[in-house]
Regions:
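Acetyl-CoA-dependent GNAT
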Residues: 6, 10-84, 89-90, 102-104, ...
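Basic/polar N-terminal segments that are highly enriched at the extreme N-terminus
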Residues: 1-5
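C-terminal "cap" of GNAT-fold acetyltransferases
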Residues: 115-118, 122-135, 141-158
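Conserved glycine-rich acetyl-CoA-binding loop
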Residues: 66, 80-81, 85, 89-103, ...
């Protein structure tokens, strides 16, 4: 892991929110290319029309001042939130950004009074799966209708 200057911040300015949105759109392109399928079933078109309304919080990671990674926390149902769209640009990899962003999201969720955090990921995304496992996420049953067969559903008790 590199010791290059890394900053993790809660995206609140218009500029930071726009940078998170751009990273999220890059994430969708990456995932759709990786899976060879559209994520439209997740309601992404509506999500980005009203962005960032659906999110409780957005986090942005910067490396040497440049936007490199992001994630968000969405309410799912009472007491449960969902970690969404954790993505690190290739230029930002190797700095532990995925771990740092997820840790920030967990701290937020605890402070906000959530008792569980859900997420879904692809089993083939080994680095992401390792982060989640190391942080204590465990496998759960499918919690939404997802037509993709390789999804993994996980939860963390907060």
């Amino acid at each position: 892991m590199s010791s290059t200057a890394v900053t993790i911040l809660q995206a609140s300015s218009e500029q930071d929110i726009a940078q998170v949105k751009l990273i999220f759109l890059e994430y969708l392109d990456f995932i759709e290319s990786y899976l060879g399928e559209s994520l439209g079933f997740q309601g992404t078109e509506q999500e980005f029309k009203t962005f960032p309304q659906a999110y409780d919080v957005l986090y942005l990671a910067k490396v040497k001042g440049e936007p490199a990674a992001a994630c968000g926390v969405k309410p799912f149902k009472p007491g449960i939130c969902e970690l969404k769209r954790l993505y690190c640009r290739p230029s930002g990899r190797g700095h532990g950004l995925g771990l740092k962003l997820t840790q920030n999201a967990i701290r937020f969720a605890k402070a906000a009074g959530y008792t569980q955090m859900y997420l879904d990921t692809d089993r083939g995304l080994t680095f992401a799966n390792k982060i989640y496992e190391d942080l204590g996420f465990t496998d759960i049953e499918r919690y939404y209708d997802n037509p993709m067969g390789c999804s993994r559903y996980m939860a963390l008790w907060l």
